[in-house]
Amino acid sequence: MNWLEAFILGIIQGLTEFLPISSTGHLYLGRHLFQLDEAGLFLDTMLHIGTLLAVFIYYKKEFIYLIKNPFSKLMLLLIVGTIPAVVIGLLFKDFFEDISKTGITIGWEFLVTGFFLYMADKQKNGRKKMDDITYKDAFIIGSFQAAAIFPAISRSGMTIVAALWRKLDRETAAYFSFLLSTPAIVGAIILQFADVFQGKAESISNTSLIVGTLSAAFFGYIAVSWMIQYLKRHSLKVFAYYVWGLGIIIITLQYTHVF
């Protein structure tokens, strides 16, 4: 893999991690385009580190607060919201890894993501701010996040949808969704490093790794800040239409054996 391919994959990871269109699904397509085995598993890990850096930079005040106040309500909300994904991930890790490798359901998963994004805008706007989020809210939002263990189910999309259904206001829904992404991204990095140390990763140059990581961090930061502002006044339907179109194209190509 050359540095330009790593740069492009970094853009894909950075933007799609925080736009509600599934980063894993798009990375799968990117890997297929560049004909990469296992994506370059180590590169995948570094791309996730890039998006983690983006979240840390954007939420630096919140993370400083969490470090100083490890037993705060915000910390407990993040823990409660992470529990469903941890449980599902540990119980069904091998099953979902097999699905991710084959990509056989990816088109249908994009369609499911689109359905939830479309239905979310049917809800009346809520008024809950960060201080109003309950542990029940966090658990339900986290349960939707657990569904994103399927490769083309958008994590940010599902958590934003769940947050809107729990009557968080639109800005807070995106804000909490991205904050909740931190434990999920850390978990993905840990699992990927485990596979790397087992020798499953292909060799990639240091230049490509650095370029991919910085690209993911830069475009991830842009996506976080843009999406929070976008959701204040705009609909999720445009993303629903996009993933529906993408899903239909993928299913068609799979059934005609082109993809």
Swiss-Prot record:
Class of enzymatic activity (EC top level): hydrolase
Subcellular location as annotated: Cell membrane
SS bond list: none
One Gene Ontology term, aspect cellular component: plasma membrane
Keyword Oxidoreductase: no
GO function terms (MF aspect): undecaprenyl-diphosphatase activity
A matching Pfam family: BacA
Keywords from the named record: Antibiotic resistance, Cell membrane, Cell shape, Cell wall biogenesis/degradation, Hydrolase, Membrane, Peptidoglycan synthesis, Transmembrane, Transmembrane helix
EC number: 3.6.1.27
Transmembrane segments: 1-21, 39-59, 71-91, 99-119, 133-153, 173-193, 208-228, 239-259
Additional remark text: Bacitracin is thought to be involved in the inhibition of peptidoglycan synthesis by sequestering undecaprenyl diphosphate, thereby reducing the pool of lipid carrier available.
Role noted for this protein: Catalyzes the dephosphorylation of undecaprenyl diphosphate (UPP). Confers resistance to bacitracin.
HAMAP family according to UniProt: Undec_diphosphatase
Name of the protein in its database record: Undecaprenyl-diphosphatase 4
Organism: Bacillus thuringiensis (strain Al Hakam)
Organismal lineage: Bacteria, Bacillati, Bacillota, Bacilli, Bacillales
Annotated gene: uppP4
